[in-house]
Amino acid sequence: MHIVLEFFLVTFRVLWAFVLAAAKWFVRPKDKNVAGQVCLITGAGSGLGRLFALEFARRRAQLVLWDINPQSNEETADMVRDIYRQLQAEDSARRANSSADEEVLPCCNLQVYTYTCDVGKRESVYSTAERVRREVGDVYLLLNNAGVVSGHHLLECPDELIERTMMVNCHAHFWTTKAFLPKMMEMNHGHIVSVASSLGLFSTAGVEDYCASKFGVVGFHESLSHELKAADKDGIKTTLVCPYLVDTGMFRGCRIRKEIEPFLPPLKPDYCVKQAMRAILTDQPMICTPRLMYIVLCMKSILPFEAVVCMYRFLGADKCMYPFIAQRKQATNNNETKNGI
């Protein structure tokens, strides 16, 4: 009898979860305040990582930027400092013009910290994390964004590039999380964001290593989320970001069927990051951009494999990576010729 009652209770909770999820489509939850919180972003030197840094800077977060390229990382930091200076100038002007009863945001001593770190190397992650704890303090939000792509067919891809892709895109999530999660669990306070890809939910030809790494991120993130729930650490939030192809140059040359592309073009980086920020700031567990990706994921889960192949061929998604791979191969050959190899 006890299990029957529990079954009805679980059914009610499942239905209630659907109601709450549906309500969020009509009433957007209020964004949480990250002002003064330490937010660490990997791969901050370019692409989405840089845009994430600028968005968090506008929300007055203290930023810790990691990248393997110190020059590009400093360029991002300079952009962040410009935003901080603008915010402080606005605060000063508002404070000068405000009445005694008017509430004005406190002028925080906003700072940005840069660290050169190869997240594909475990020792580099752990040693840099120790420096962050010592020089900055405890990290509230960890945004795992760093990623690479080899751009080779499987049988033409050197083993070292396969290993590098797995290390940077997937294994780094384990190492950064192990470095910063203990303090979050101690405080029951924090947020872990995993930037994966739609190619971590469904795959295509020619990017076996990249797909495997992103599928790994999705599996890692989901298991971590369940582990935090099992440990009753409800104060630690997790968000999985799975965007469609983003126009950052990482997959330059990738093309689906030309008749379909106007309806499903590559995402603008700004749009992708703004959608992800909405999810992060409202503690949304997962976001796929565009929303059409949810439908594709559902169809992939229920349709026979041959039906999925037919859909891929119709959309031109079965060989969409081939032009990209050809461009990468041509660029490699040109560099070798230029260097006399």
From Swiss-Prot:
Name used for this protein in its record: Retinol dehydrogenase 10-B
Residues that coordinate or bind NADP(+): 40-64
Organism: Xenopus laevis (African clawed frog)
Endoplasmic reticulum listed as a keyword: yes
Family, similarity comment: Belongs to the short-chain dehydrogenases/reductases (SDR) family.
Binding site for substrate: 197
Keyword field: Endoplasmic reticulum, Membrane, Microsome, NADP, Oxidoreductase, Signal-anchor, Transmembrane, Transmembrane helix
EC number: 1.1.1.300
Parts of the chain that traverse the membrane: 3-23
One function term, GO molecular function aspect: oxidoreductase activity, acting on the CH-OH group of donors, NAD or NADP as acceptor
Compartments it resides in: Microsome membrane; Endoplasmic reticulum membrane
Major site of localization recorded for this protein: membrane
Functional description taken from the UniProt entry: Retinol dehydrogenase with a clear preference for NADP. Converts all-trans-retinol to all-trans-retinal. Has no detectable activity towards 11-cis-retinol, 9-cis-retinol and 13-cis-retinol.
Any one of the GO CC terms: endoplasmic reticulum membrane
Pathway: Cofactor metabolism; retinol metabolism
Phylogenetic lineage: Eukaryota, Metazoa, Chordata, Craniata, Vertebrata
